[in-house]
């Protein structure tokens, strides 16, 4: 797949550099590479809803002032179908055909890692709101993110289950074919065994994307004597695993990760997920200030509480707009303007996001805190504690 993507990129590269590289001076165009269909369409919906709400708010107030000129925002949404190859194709279209100044997304690491390669190759700023895999930004000066990384999230989960449940033995179940759960599972295992010693992860079970029967792996986990099950899977897969585990006799805690944090989780899982915990980026219940304003506005407009993807998309888009403002003026030359935006993104410090304060490292990753959420007996995501670097 990598060879075909790079071949496609080279073909487009020839086309791009044979045409004028300028953009409309009347609107600021931003591309969104998001999953509107496929395995995780709720992620795409949340992303688009948050972006549209922000765009309407800014355009309604007159637009974005950059230097001595004011621009309206134009957002272009491309469906990456929750697939890596579609994400790269979407990035190429946004960059070369739509000639956006920057790209927001993809969200999931499986799509963000390859799309990041394309954006960096074309020197186009990209901000992934939700991708926690280090490979997304590694050695890619044009690629940023609005969330913490898995090398931080893995130890957060390992320390939490140790302190909260007194866990001395852990089991892990994850999709070996997907970048996000595979990476996070490995970081959790390393952190847990650093605390409790080699072999304390007594079951390290895998499956592959689209599997629906986990009975063999879960039987091994139940028999392993583990005190905790770590399940770093997406919200659409979690209910299947949880219900099958409970049917096989699992009565101990299950710890999740930020990929649990979708409103869709409780529709699919219901009471089976009550009482479980997961690490994430923000908690809607009990929010205050600008975060509460965002939640109330989103809930009023769309009829449900925004998940972490919506909140992170809001923050990622605002980060981009701040960087654009900080250029102090756009030239109309898309290469120069993309470079200027990239440079300003790297300089952002103490950005007050609704998911927390952020300062970018030289790698394009924000230094920020994680939140531990408990799923209440009402099915709500309740703030439990905050964990900072």
Where are these regions (language model features)?
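Extracytosolic ligand-binding ectodomains
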Residues: 2-4, 8-11, 23-389
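C-terminal segment of classical bacterial N-terminal signal peptides
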Residues: 15-23
């Amino acid at each position: 797949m990598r060879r075909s993507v790079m071949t496609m990129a080279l073909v487009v590269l020839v086309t791009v550099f044979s045409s004028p590289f300028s953009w409309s001076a009347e609107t600021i165009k931003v591309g969104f590479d998001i999953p509107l269909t496929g395995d995780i369409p709720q992620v795409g919906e949340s992303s688009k809803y948050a972006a549209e709400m922000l765009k309407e708010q800014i355009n309604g107030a007159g637009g974005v002032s950059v230097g001595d000129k004011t621009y309206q925002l134009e957002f272009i949404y491309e469906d990456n179908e929750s697939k890596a190859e579609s994400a790269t194709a979407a990035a190429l279209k946004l960059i070369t055909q739509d000639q956006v100044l920057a790209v927001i997304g993809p969200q999931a690491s499986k799509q963000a890692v390859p799309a990041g390669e394309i954006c960096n190759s074309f020197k186009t700023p990209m901000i992934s709101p939700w991708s926690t895999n280090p490979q997304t930004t590694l050695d890619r000066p044009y690629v940023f993110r609005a969330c913490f990384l898995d090398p931080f999230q893995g130890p957060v989960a390992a320390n939490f289950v140790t302190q909260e449940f007194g866990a001395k033995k852990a089991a892990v179940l994850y999709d070996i074919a997907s970048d996000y759960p595979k990476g996070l599972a490995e970081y959790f295992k390393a952190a847990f065994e650093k605390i409790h010693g080699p072999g304390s992860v007594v079951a390290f079970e895998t499956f592959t994307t689209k599997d629906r029967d986990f009975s063999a792996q879960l039987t091994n986990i139940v028999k392993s004597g583990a005190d905790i099950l770590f399940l770093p899977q997406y919200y659409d897969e979690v209910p299947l695993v949880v219900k099958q585990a409970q049917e096989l006799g699992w009565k101990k805690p299950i710890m999740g990760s930020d990929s649990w944090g979708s409103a869709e989780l409780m529709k699919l899982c219901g009471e089976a997920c009550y009482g479980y915990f997961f690490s994430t980026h923000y908690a809607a219940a009990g929010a205050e200030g600008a975060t509460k304003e965002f939640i109330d506005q989103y809930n009023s407009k769309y009829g449900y509480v925004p998940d972490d993807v919506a909140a992170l998309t809001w923050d990622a888009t605002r980060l981009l707009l701040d960087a654009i403002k900080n250029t102090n003026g756009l030239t109309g030359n898309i290469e120069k303007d993309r470079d200027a935006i990239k440079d300003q993104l790297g300089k952002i410090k103490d950005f007050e996001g609704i998911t927390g304060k952020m300062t970018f490292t030289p790698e394009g990753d924000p230094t920020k805190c994680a939140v531990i959420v408990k799923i209440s007996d009402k099915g709500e995501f309740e703030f439990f504690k905050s964990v900072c670097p």
